[in-house]
A protein has these predicted regions:
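Short, well-structured beta-strand/strand-turn elements
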Residues: 1-10
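Active-site rim recognition segments
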Residues: 11-111
Length: 112
């Protein structure tokens, strides 16, 4: 298994999120998200356990590993030592931790 993180991109409800992928011989990497538990829409066993062997399509992957070095390398300690969903900011005086800067992301949902 390995770690993945990024953003849940559900319409009107996007946020940072982490999940996993499990490798099955002959199938490949299968995403799982145990944090979603049993969905309220579940009407049968396949739907109840969907997130234990599947994942919805509302994900944007930022990381497929954790604790990796940044390029270019930072001079000061990182704000986030596990993943890199929001990015890192530093200046000649040191690291700027998350409360000292913000980000903005526009999301456009396309109809099929």
């Amino acid at each position: 298994a390995h770690f993945q993180s990024g953003f849940m991109m559900h319409p009107k409800a996007w946020n940072l999120h982490d999940w996993a992928e499990i490798y099955f011989e002959g199938i490949g990497w299968v995403p799982v998200d145990q944090s979603f538990g049993i969905p309220t829409f579940a009407r049968n066993a396949d739907e109840e356990y969907f997130f234990l062997g599947g994942i919805d399509s509302w994900r944007m992957i930022v990381n497929s590993d954790y604790g990796m070095p940044l390029i270019p390398e930072k001079k000061y300690p990182r704000s986030e030592t596990v993943d890199f969903q929001r990015g890192e900011v530093e200046w000649e005086g040191g690291n700027l931790y998350f409360p000292k800067w913000d980000y903005h992301m526009d999301i456009e949902y396309l109809d099929n």
